Structures are given as structure tokens and as C-alpha cells.
């Protein structure tokens, strides 16, 4: 019986470190997606016409906040980053606080809500990126990526980071749900093995 408790404590410590690593990766992915998209801006000057031989120039700026889907993308990724930062802080600095009962259920629910939030934001931004890249002939929306290549490249990088965050949050959410079945599987990283029954 004592050997099984030690084995369970060792497994618990390993699963805690894996979950902490996954949360750190998800935090990094979602934060980088929010920062890259939030700073995404490109300004170019184009010739829009001619008066005689004199070209008429106009300056246009492509910014993330010109599209509501990209604003939603930045806000959602920032919220998921903040959630993961709080969970990391609780796991590292939580002392001997056990995640059981309502606390465990609330963490699992928050993880599932964050998966939904970041998935919706990434898909909305991916749709708008597709319109920006290829346009929409039926709606007569012109593509812009042939004119604002850097803007589109930065947006693509943010989307890649966000979809990596979606995958990581799915794994974290599955781990949170599995902890509902085995509540003492992962407590704080600083908790002693004697906490595990």
C-alpha cells in the first residue's frame, strides 16, 4: 500500500510538471498571437490616378483594428493568456492548496470556455485572412495581400500561433476533465507527497 502511494505521488508530480509545461506553451502561443496581431500594421502609398502626366498618390494603412474579427482575435488570445498565467501562478505559488471539488470543476469549466473562445477567435480571423488573401468575387471584395504582403504575413504568423494555442488548450482541457475523475492526480507543484491519499 505504501509503495502504491509513493508511485501515485511520483506520477502526480510528473503529470503536474507536464500540465505546467503545457500551460506555459499555451500561454506563450496565445500571448505571441495577441501581440503579433495587435502590432500588425502596414502603410503604403499607391498611385490612384493621373491628372495629365502627374500621378495622384494616396496613402493607405492596413491595421488589425480595421476588422472586427481581428479585434476579437486579439482580445480572446489576451484573455486566454491571462487565464493560463493565473493557472500557472496558482500551480507554482499555490502552496499546499488542493484542487478538489468545486475548485477542480471550476478550473475544468474555465479551460473548456477558453478552448471555445480561442477556437472561435482563430476561426473568425482565419476566415477574414482568407478573404484578404483571395478576395470574394460574389461580394465584390478585393484581395489585399497582393498589396500589403507584410501585413498578411504577420497575420498568418499570428494565426499559426493561435491554432497552436487551440491544440494546447484542447489537451489542457482534456487533462482538466480527466482530473475530475481522479481529483488528486495533480495538486500544487510545491505540495508534499503526503497530501496524496
From Swiss-Prot:
Topological region Extracellular: 39-69, 128-156
UniProt modified residues of type N-acetylalanine: 2
Gene Ontology CC: plasma membrane
KW Acetylation (keyword) present: yes
Taxonomy of the source species: Eukaryota, Viridiplantae, Streptophyta, Embryophyta, Tracheophyta
Subunit structure: Homodimer and heterodimers.
A Pfam family: CASP_dom
Predominant subcellular localization, coarse grouping: membrane
Similarity-based family: Belongs to the Casparian strip membrane proteins (CASP) family.
Protein name: CASP-like protein 1B1
Amino acid at each position: 500500500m505504501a509503495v502504491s502511494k509513493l508511485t501515485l505521488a511520483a506520477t502526480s508530480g510528473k503529470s503536474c510538471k507536464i500540465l505546467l509545461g503545457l500551460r506555459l506553451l499555451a500561454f506563450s502561443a496565445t500571448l505571441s498571437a495577441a501581440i503579433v496581431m495587435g502590432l500588425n500594421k502596414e502603410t503604403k502609398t499607391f498611385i490612384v490616378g493621373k491628372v495629365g502626366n502627374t500621378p495622384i498618390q494616396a496613402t493607405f494603412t492596413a491595421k488589425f483594428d480595421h476588422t472586427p474579427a481581428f479585434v476579437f482575435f486579439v482580445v480572446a488570445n489576451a484573455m486566454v493568456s491571462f487565464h493560463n498565467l493565473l493557472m500557472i501562478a496558482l500551480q507554482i505559488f499555490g502552496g499546499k492548496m488542493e484542487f478538489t471539488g468545486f475548485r477542480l470543476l471550476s478550473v475544468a469549466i474555465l479551460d473548456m470556455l477558453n478552448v471555445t473562445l480561442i477556437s472561435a477567435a482563430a476561426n473568425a480571423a482565419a476566415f477574414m485572412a482568407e478573404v484578404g488573401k483571395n478576395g470574394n468575387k460574389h461580394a465584390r471584395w478585393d484581395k489585399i495581400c497582393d498589396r500589403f504582403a507584410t501585413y498578411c504575413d504577420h497575420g498568418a504568423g499570428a494565426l499559426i500561433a493561435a491554432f497552436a494555442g487551440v491544440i494546447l488548450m484542447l489537451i489542457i482541457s482534456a487533462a482538466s476533465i480527466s482530473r475530475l475523475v481522479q481529483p488528486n492526480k495533480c495538486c500544487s507543484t510545491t505540495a508534499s507527497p503526503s497530501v496524496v491519499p
